[in-house]
A protein has these predicted regions:
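Short glycine/serine/threonine-rich phosphate/pyrophosphate-binding segments
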Residues: 3-6, 29, 54-61, 79-83, ...
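Short, well-ordered alpha-helices that flank and scaffold nucleotide-derived cofactor binding pockets
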Residues: 12, 37, 60-64, 190, ...
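Structural motif
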Residues: 17-18, 45-48, 69-71, 105-107, ...
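A short, small-residue-rich loop immediately preceding and capping a beta-strand
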Residues: 39-62, 66-77
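A glycine/threonine-rich phosphate-anchoring loop and its flanking beta-alpha core
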Residues: 64-148, 152-153
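ATP/NTP phosphate-donor binding region
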Residues: 1-46
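Active-site segments that bind and position negatively charged phosphate/pyrophosphate groups
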Residues: 136, 140-216
């Protein structure tokens, strides 16, 4: 639960119905169903997810079935918070889909909340964003607008990640990486998933490989 202190900080001014920290990579369907039951039992009317792609993915799984809106506070550069794409894993088979219900209503980007993300994880996460950008250039619905966003995302990530490697506390580098991650997600959501991303989903779901590192 490395993000719990950050979550406590983020939610300090709101009434929290329940805290839920049972987050698992690739969102196993059992984990998703348990989280849905917690949300319904506690009459949750807003999901605030603080963390990386797995945390956002779990919130999306809850929203998919319940329609509860999401406020996402990302602490990595995965970009999932800015897409309408969901993913669930059952018996080592990962299924993904698109639904407007899983697109967060609000996303809060704060570079200071990413300062505790280790350099190695920061780079892997940023390369996941880079993969979103590359897929956006040739995915099924790629177009000039997607390409422009993806190109800017690549430039931002390429500028920010080396600064983070050089100084993990570089706000400038973290700002650029978050900006690039957002652009990568928006372009990816519009263009659709290319073969590269689908392969990573299959490998990740089958062999339980971490998504960001698989891309990297």
């Amino acid at each position: 639960e490395p993000e719990m202190p950050i979550a406590k900080q983020v939610a300090s001014e709101i009434e929290v119905a329940v805290w839920h920290s049972d987050v698992v990579m690739h969102v196993p369907i059992e984990t998703a169903q348990a989280a849905r039951e917690v949300a319904v039992d506690n009459q949750v009317d807003l999901l605030v997810c603080v963390g990386g792609g797995s945390t956002t993915g779990l919130a999306k799984a809850v929203a998919l079935e319940t329609g509860i809106p999401i406020v996402a506070v990302p602490t990595t550069y995965a970009g999932s918070e800015a897409t309408n794409v969901w993913g669930l894993t059952e018996a080592k088979r990962k299924t993904t889909g698109v639904d407007i219900k899983v697109l967060p209503e609000t996303v809060i980007y704060d570079s200071k909340l990413t300062l505790s993300l280790p350099v190695e994880m920061s780079v892997a996460s940023g390369l996941n964003g880079m993969a979103h950008c590359v897929d956006s250039l040739w995915a099924p619905k790629a177009d000039p607008i997607n390409a422009a966003l993806a190109g800017e995302g690549i430039r931002a990530l390429s500028a920010g990640l080396p600064k983070i490697v050089e100084d993990s506390q570089s706000i400038e580098g973290r700002d650029e990486a978050l900006y690039g991650a957002y652009l990568s997600a928006v372009s990816f959501a519009s263009a659709g998933s290319g073969l590269h991303h689908k392969i990573c989903h299959v490998l990740g779901g089958t062999f339980n490989l971490p998504h960001a590192q698989t891309h990297a």
